[in-house]
Swiss-Prot record:
Cystine pairs: none
Cellular component aspect of the GO annotation: cytosol
Protein name per UniProt: Ribosome maturation factor RimP
Function: Required for maturation of 30S ribosomal subunits.
Length: 152
């Protein structure tokens, strides 16, 4: 997925501190708005609880206070990826081969920006998704947002 320069910088800066606490840094979203939000998704083999989020929030806040990579006021949110897990990297798509994903593209493909289908394959920076019985190929750099589709 095409991360912004700031999101890439934050991912590089915060991966080690999050991993030092025993968690995987799943991804980072920075939402610019009147009140901006820095959202950090973490995970572990044992799942995530509120105390885990608080520990990571404390550690990340300390790093951000020193490095000051964000120049505007923002709220910091730390959470688990949830059932509709966001997808950020080629590795995420590989991990969830065969699962259903919802995509929002930066640039339309076949006059569509929204797609939903089964993840079939990952080849470098390209993914193949089976949509209504037809394989569609998307560049990760063209994916603005991607989430797993939970089934109950």
């Amino acid at each position: 997925m095409g991360l912004s320069t700031l999101e890439q910088k934050l991912t590089e800066m915060l991966s080690a501190p999050v991993e030092a606490l025993g968690f995987e840094l799943v991804g980072i979203e920075f939402i610019r708005a009147r009140q901006s939000t820095l959202r950090i998704y973490i995970d572990s083999e044992n799942g995530i609880n509120v105390d885990d989020c608080a520990d990571v929030s404390h550690q990340v806040s300390a790093v951000l206070d020193v490095e000051e990579p964000i120049t505007v006021a923002y709220n910091l949110e730390v959470s688990s990826p949830g059932l509709d897990r966001p997808m950020f990297t080629a590795e995420h798509y590989t991990r969830f081969l065969g699962d259903e994903v919802s995509l929002v593209l930066r640039m339309a493909v076949q006059n569509r920006r929204k797609w939903q289908g089964i993840i079939k394959s990952v080849d470098g920076e390209m993914i193949t998704v089976a949509v209504e019985g037809k394989d569609e190929v998307f560049a990760l750099s063209n994916i603005q947002k991607a989430n797993l589709v939970p089934h109950f």
